[in-house]
Amino acid sequence: MDHLPIFCQLRDRDCLIVGGGDVAERKARLLLEAGARLTVNALTFIPQFTVWVNEGMLTLVEGPFDETLLDSCWLAIAATDDDTVNQRVSEAAESRRIFCNVVDAPKAASFIMPSIIDRSPLMVAVSSGGTSPVLARLLREKLESLLPQHLGQVARYAGQLRARVKKQFATMGERRRFWEKFFVNDRLAQSLANADEKAVNATTEHLFSEPLDHRGEVVLVGAGPGDAGLLTLKGLQQIQQADIVVYDRLVSDDIMNLVRRDADRVFVGKRAGYHCVPQEEINQILLREAQKGKRVVRLKGGDPFIFGRGGEELETLCHAGIPFSVVPGITAASGCSAYSGIPLTHRDYAQSVRLVTGHLKTGGELDWENLAAEKQTLVFYMGLNQAATIQEKLIAFGMEANMPVALVENGTSVKQRVVHGVLTQLGELAQQVESPALIIVGRVVALRDKLNWFSNH
């Protein structure tokens, strides 16, 4: 280990920055956020420094580097574009045993500045030891996505409750279980973010009053249409907090690789016309695991409330009194159309879009007359096996036979394939495509030749 990570208490302590440009401004912003009493020494200053002076936030000393400014300092930063000046600052600080950071010259510095994730009072610092700042920044961005913006408020509130927790729970094990419940409680986090004091108090009292071995909860999470980059931040956070993940065939391997390593995984995949696990059994799996006190994530492709039977699963939990929540996902219609260069609505061609199930039950009948109307886009989910029927019915109820159609297979993934033609070819085109696939019908499909971008990458 070349550098020891430490967190400095700089509030009301003298610090010096030498330099008045953009880099110095970024460093000054960090020190000001930490509460430092800051002096900036430079020949010239960008306008932001004048703003800070007018607000009484720092002191400017215009002119060449004056090493006597270091005499009362706790910490210094050399941030000029002159290597000679930066070296002088470093040597002067070293002679006074003052820690000094030299921008872009880690070997000349006695400390380096990490990439920072600020969820005060929670702070995360990422450093490559000065060898690869870009790598540190990329790692910071990944970690940013895992930590909710309101996490700092939750941590601060936890500090206010420490004495009460210590008083109410006698053992370390009890306290640990309480804090585990506390930090994964979405209702509390959202109430704190909304500054809803009444809801915060109610949720807090509930946490203190319920047994520590209470029943678990289920979070219904939409995984999006395939591309792992389309999983929402909240969805990612939930699957990384799960004790068990119950998932289906439409959840990609890339997304499953993001699941917490020690979480149990239960596959309940389905295919049209064949159910690996009956829906009632899935409902019972969710119920049984939650009753064991586990945090269960039901992970579904697309959005769980759009042809995902999410409502049915939650009704079972609701009847049993199991707490649940829902994290929406990008539905296949939105993701597949965007990655195919097909806008679902367009001022000239479609003023509405209709999402339709093609998985028709025996005796079921769609409102074909309205579906065949002009100026709209139709998106059929699970429609491959019914493609010939969809073609026949739409034409019979007045849709033009040459209406553009597209079938999107494995949408948004690297395996995406788009087959397109006109309505009279729909049944034939469906024979060329494998599930999972989406059928899009409407004049907007003709825009694909202009707007297709994904296949070019």
Curated annotation (Swiss-Prot):
S-adenosyl-L-methionine binds at residues 225, 301-303, 306, 331-332, 382, 411. The active site is at 248 (proton acceptor), 270 (proton donor). NAD(+) binds at residues 22-23, 43-44. It catalyses: uroporphyrinogen III + 2 S-adenosyl-L-methionine = precorrin-2 + 2 S-adenosyl-L-homocysteine + H(+); precorrin-2 + NAD(+) = sirohydrochlorin + NADH + 2 H(+); siroheme + 2 H(+) = sirohydrochlorin + Fe(2+). Residues 216-457 are annotated as: Uroporphyrinogen-III C-methyltransferase. InterPro entries: 4pyrrol_Mease, 4pyrrol_Methylase_sf, 4pyrrole_Mease_sub1, 4pyrrole_Mease_sub2, CobA/CysG_C, NAD(P)-bd_dom_sf, Siro_Cobalamin_biosynth, Sirohaem_synt_dimer_dom_sf. GO terms for biological process: cobalamin biosynthetic process; methylation; siroheme biosynthetic process. Its EC number is 2.1.1.107, 1.3.1.76, 4.99.1.4. Residues 1-204 are annotated as: Precorrin-2 dehydrogenase /sirohydrochlorin ferrochelatase. The modification Phosphoserine is found at residue 128. GO terms for molecular function: NAD binding; precorrin-2 dehydrogenase activity; sirohydrochlorin ferrochelatase activity; uroporphyrin-III C-methyltransferase activity. Keywords: Cobalamin biosynthesis, Lyase, Methyltransferase, Multifunctional enzyme, NAD, Oxidoreductase, Phosphoprotein, Porphyrin biosynthesis, S-adenosyl-L-methionine, Transferase. Pathway: Cofactor biosynthesis; adenosylcobalamin biosynthesis; precorrin-2 from uroporphyrinogen III: step 1/1; Cofactor biosynthesis; adenosylcobalamin biosynthesis; sirohydrochlorin from precorrin-2: step 1/1; Porphyrin-containing compound metabolism; siroheme biosynthesis; precorrin-2 from uroporphyrinogen III: step 1/1; Porphyrin-containing compound metabolism; siroheme biosynthesis; siroheme from sirohydrochlorin: step 1/1. In the N-terminal section; belongs to the precorrin-2 dehydrogenase / sirohydrochlorin ferrochelatase family. In the C-terminal section; belongs to the precorrin methyltransferase family. Then it catalyzes the NAD-dependent ring dehydrogenation of precorrin-2 to yield sirohydrochlorin. Finally, it catalyzes the ferrochelation of sirohydrochlorin to yield siroheme. HAMAP family: Siroheme_synth (MF_01646). This is Siroheme synthase.
